[in-house]
């Protein structure tokens, strides 16, 4: 009798498990990506900073902060590529710089993205915000284009193709490039939402954006609050459905044009950039409040980070006069190879798994998101998926952090310069900044400087003392690791993969030539 009851119980439980539409173990996931937000712009990361960010600080107090987090690139497009694919951006056909608003799609439809991974594992997936990974515009004629198209050739009455919906997103709503790059239109599920009715530009110090066609429903200073409004609508709708959701929310701010709305102008007492950061903080607070109000906070993971360091458009001189430094204690800023260009604020709140107020000092990279999600879902990635993505899940508790597998991290600048970091040491394979700060590439700034740069970030976080030549064994080891990372097409364990051809020139790409 007992045996019969046992089998009936097991059968009943199996029936419930096999027929349950929603797996409550799978967390909802919201990934908020700020644009050009400096490490030192958030109070919890820079206590001497002068911008008040109470809501992001609150998010941090409810979760975990990562003090040694890095974007895979120091500029926009490449970092986004790395987040969505778990692959270093320089393995793609874009070896340096960024795309513009009319560029073709960068991510192949054949490549797994975090959205397609989650969609295939029962998630409802959404993208709302700044895309900046290219999509294919419909043209007025049959002209073929490989890289980017002239604005006057675009047919704004037809749908785009090879956009977010083809890369795993069930729902998509956003604009193509940065908010200073035309065309200025919203695209919802491949369809342009408004008619072009004007050509506009702005030449203001902070409000600057390029001249271009603009849709009737597109107002620059309303874009950021509009995206948050759409995000609220998505979350409210999807949380009622019988499946977990993933929302990728890449903001167009505080990147140029720097346009705080009424109520926030002058709020910081510093300048428009600081006002804009405070406005973003407010929106993040409203998003966090919504999750609490819907009673889904316990098993909702919220990630907040930035795509790279702060841009000089923030007006560093004026901010410094008021004792605020967007890069905090670090050297450099957006576009370069120094820490201020790629060390970013990084927060994860997930009450079900993360103890509030936690801190991790381990080095992580924005490419690690795919590996983390695969680990959470207990999904084994295929050999060509997430090739540079190491699960951060072990870092969510002190007991398991010994299982974190990332041994080194590679950094990349706007002009294609590289650096590699392992432990305390960072080895930069150029004698300049690789970007916009001193010493500038292609200038006389680097004359007389050593070929490479080596810094001990533990003793010299500001990268002020070049140790190149003083530690030959460390340098040799780091060069070997870098060479293997290039030639193996991956940094995770697995079969050798191929890096993509250079684009649009298709010339041979060989960063190892710097060692000859």
Where are these regions (language model features)?
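Formylglycine-dependent sulfatase
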Residues: 2-5, 18-453, 461-494, 499, ...
């Amino acid at each position: 009798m007992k045996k019969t009851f046992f089998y009936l119980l097991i059968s009943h439980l199996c029936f419930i498990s096999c027929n349950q539409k929603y797996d409550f173990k799978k967390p909802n996931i919201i990934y908020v990506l700020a644009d050009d937000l400096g490490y030192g712009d958030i109070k919890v990361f820079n206590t001497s900073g002068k911008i008040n960010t109470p809501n992001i600080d609150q998010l941090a107090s409810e979760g975990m902060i990562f003090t040694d987090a890095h974007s895979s690139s120091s500029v926009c497009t490449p970092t986004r590529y790395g987040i969505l694919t778990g692959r270093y951006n320089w393995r793609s056909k874009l070896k340096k710089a960024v795309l513009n608003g009319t560029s073709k799609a960068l991510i192949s439809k054949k490549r797994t993205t975090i959205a397609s991974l989650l969609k295939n594992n029962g998630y409802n997936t959404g993208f709302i915000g700044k895309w900046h990974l290219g999509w294919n515009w419909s043209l007025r004629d049959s002209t073929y284009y490989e890289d980017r198209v002239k604005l006057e050739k675009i047919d704004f009455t037809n749908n785009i193709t090879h956009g977010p919906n083809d890369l795993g997103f069930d729902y998509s709503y956003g604009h193509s490039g940065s908010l200073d790059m035309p065309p200025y239109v919203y695209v919802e599920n491949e369809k342009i939402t408004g008619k072009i009715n004007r050509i506009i530009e702005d030449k203001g110090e902070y409000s600057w954006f390029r001249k271009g066609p603009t849709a009737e429903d597109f107002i620059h200073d309303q874009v950021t609050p509009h995206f948050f409004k759409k995000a609220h609508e998505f979350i409210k709708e999807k949380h009622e459905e019988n499946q977990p959701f993933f929302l990728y929310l890449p903001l167009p701010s505080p990147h140029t044009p720097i346009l705080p709305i009424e109520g926030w102008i002058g709020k910081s007492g510093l300048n428009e950039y600081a006002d804009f950061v405070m406005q973003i903080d407010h929106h993040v607070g409203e998003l966090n409040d919504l999750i609490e109000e819907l009673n889904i906070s316990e098993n909702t993971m919220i990630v907040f980070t930035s795509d790279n360091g702060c841009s000089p458009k923030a007006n560093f001189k004026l901010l410094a006069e008021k004792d605020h430094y967007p890069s905090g204690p670090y050297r450099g800023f957006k576009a370069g190879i120094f820490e201020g260009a790629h060390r970013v604020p990084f927060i994860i709140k997930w009450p079900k798994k993360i103890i509030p107020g936690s801190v991790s000092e381990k080095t992580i990279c924005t490419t690690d998101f795919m590996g983390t999600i695969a680990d959470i879902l207990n999904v084994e990635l295929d050999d060509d998926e997430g090739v540079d993505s190491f699960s951060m899940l072990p870092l969510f508790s002190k007991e398991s952090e010994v299982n974190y597998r990332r041994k080194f991290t590679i950094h990349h600048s706007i002009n294609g310069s590289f650096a590699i970091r392992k432990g305390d040491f960072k080895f930069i394979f150029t004698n300049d900044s690789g970007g916009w700060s001193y010493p500038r590439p292609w200038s006389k700034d680097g004359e007389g400087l050593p070929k490479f740069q080596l810094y001990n970030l533990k003793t010299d976080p500001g990268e002020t003392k070049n140790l190149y030549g003083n530690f030959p064994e460390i340098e040799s080891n780091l060069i070997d690791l870098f060479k293997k990372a290039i030639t193996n097409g991956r940094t995770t364990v697995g079969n050798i993969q191929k890096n993509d051809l250079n684009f649009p020139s298709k010339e041979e790409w060989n960063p190892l030539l710097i060692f000859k």
